[in-house]
């Protein structure tokens, strides 16, 4: 109870059939029991197949998104770039400013604050780069590509 994990359904009503578990790949947690006969689950926080492993730490894009959305100076657009430096994976977070009125010092302070929040909440050290409004490339539908994986495919 209360631990986050993958939501799995099992049908127990079928008779004379094998018990099959259905993986949803949705991450959620079971809420504490109430007087209801059925268990309740919390909101879905991400997908297990979205997980990145950076230096042994499980990183979900939804964790970074949550931190970006808490900063009023940043737009809800972000991009995670995963690369390999030697034998270690690195993560760079690109965020987008809401307004183009910031000084270089205030941009550096915002980037440092986001970097500290990511280190504290997620547990991985990242490089944070903040871009002007519309600085992150969009797809044809207007969405930013959330994860760019630049690691070599053969290793």
Features from the language model and the residues they span:
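Active-site glycine/GP-rich loop and adjacent strand/helix microenvironment
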Residues: 1-155
């Amino acid at each position: 109870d209360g631990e986050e994990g993958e939501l799995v359904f099992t049908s127990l009503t079928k008779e004379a059939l094998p018990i099959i578990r259905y993986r949803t790949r949705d991450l959620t947690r079971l809420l504490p029991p109430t007087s209801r006969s059925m268990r309740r689950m919390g909101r879905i926080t991400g997908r297990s197949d979205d997980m990145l492993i950076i230096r042994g730490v499980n990183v979900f894009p939804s964790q970074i998104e949550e931190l970006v959305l808490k900063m009023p100076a940043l737009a809800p657009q972000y991009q995670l770039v995963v690369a390999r430096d030697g034998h270690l994976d690195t993560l760079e977070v690109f965020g987008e400013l809401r307004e183009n009125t910031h000084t270089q010092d205030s941009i550096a302070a915002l980037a440092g604050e986001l970097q500290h929040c990511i280190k504290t909440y997620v547990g991985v050290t990242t490089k944070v780069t903040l871009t002007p409004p519309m600085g992150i490339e969009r797809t044809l539908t207007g969405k930013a590509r959330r994860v760019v994986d630049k690691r070599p495919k053969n290793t």
